[in-house]
């Protein structure tokens, strides 16, 4: 769906569109593209979007298209350059490690169609938090692992084992390729699906870089699965979503002990209160 929206209104509209079930967004200077599975598109959704536009004083004209699955990352992955984030150097497999970063922890990530390259603020925010909460031998749960970058980073910092899950079929292949490429495949188990595929508890660290609606749904399970001394790291959130997210966390006995922002994005480190 393509909306004629000025850039200043993108962030508040993304929050409201997310609540309607849209799962991905692409921003351009004078328009906003929003994506949802075709099976979920209804006339009621169209009318709700038009109402949002009218309330912002905008024309309620929208353009809707059905698109076929495509490996969008193939268009730009050849342009990916190594990037340093905290103690990490993130690079695609076809780039050598620049000499200036020889002492960094290398995360070799080929993205394909999965999310998590280090080029998005939400990924960088969690990577920067990780060194403060990964204990030697820690058990890690990575929700919505995407490329597997957060799992790989945690294991390279000294975590002992990880379970990584994702509902996206592309992630199943991509994450496992990246686990093998980074030499951590023997310490991580990938599972296809959502939180129901993880009956285990007592994780030292839970990682989730997903949009707010899904995070709110997963928080009760995160509270049950994290150790009393463990950490829950959340990202994929806009600054405007902070208060709602903290209220939801508090309702599940989770409190913030560290927060970080970059541009419009916000991330938080939570611990159990009881």
Model-flagged regions — what are they?
Residues 70-136:
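SAM-dependent Rossmann-like transferase core, predominantly class I methyltransferases
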Residues 113, 117-202:
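Conserved SAM/SAH cofactor-binding pocket of Class I
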Residues 1-100:
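N-terminal auxiliary segments of SAM/dcSAM-dependent transferases
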Residues 1, 32, 105, 266-268:
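Short beta-strand micro-motifs in enzyme catalytic cores
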Residues 133, 167-274:
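S-adenosylmethionine
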